[in-house]
């Protein structure tokens, strides 16, 4: 199946979160999103932030790209220390290390969800599709 067909087949919802906390900037909005793969009925619910005044509300394509990107960050690192070093958390003191560990764990959860939702062939097709997104 092509990436376009996979993306088209996914069910997607994005709802503005009741509680707007830990935002990237005051202009960002936190959404609760869900992607469902109808091929296996597996789903993933996740938080997503964007600045709708600068771009637009979340789309299935944008959210899926971010999920795949986060998953690849975790998959490309051998362990927590590698992640902290690769993404610059190691040099910022204890607070930065804590933030980095939180980010690493979130990326690992996302990678596990992507592995659960999609087959290897689907992941390959999607990663190729988003290569230059």
Regions flagged by a language model, labelled:
Residues 1-4, 31-34:
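Intrinsically disordered, low-complexity boundary segments flanking structured domains
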Residues 23-30, 36-118:
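Acidic, low-complexity, intrinsically disordered interaction modules
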Residues 130-133:
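Short acidic DE-rich linear segments
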């Amino acid at each position: 199946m092509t990436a376009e067909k996979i993306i088209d087949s996914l069910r997607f919802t994005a709802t503005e979160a009741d509680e707007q906390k830990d935002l990237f900037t005051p202009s960002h909005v936190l959404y609760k999103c869900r992607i469902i793969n109808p091929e296996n009925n597996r789903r993933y619910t996740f938080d997503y932030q964007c600045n709708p005044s600068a771009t637009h509300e979340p789309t299935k394509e944008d959210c899926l790209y971010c999920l795949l990107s986060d998953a690849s960050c975790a998959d490309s690192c051998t362990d927590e220390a590698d992640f902290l070093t690769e993404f610059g958390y190691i040099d910022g003191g204890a607070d930065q290390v804590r933030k980095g560990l939180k980010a690493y764990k979130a990326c690992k959860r996302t990678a596990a969800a992507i592995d659960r939702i999609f087959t290897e062939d689907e992941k390959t097709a999607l990663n190729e599709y988003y290569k230059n997104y």
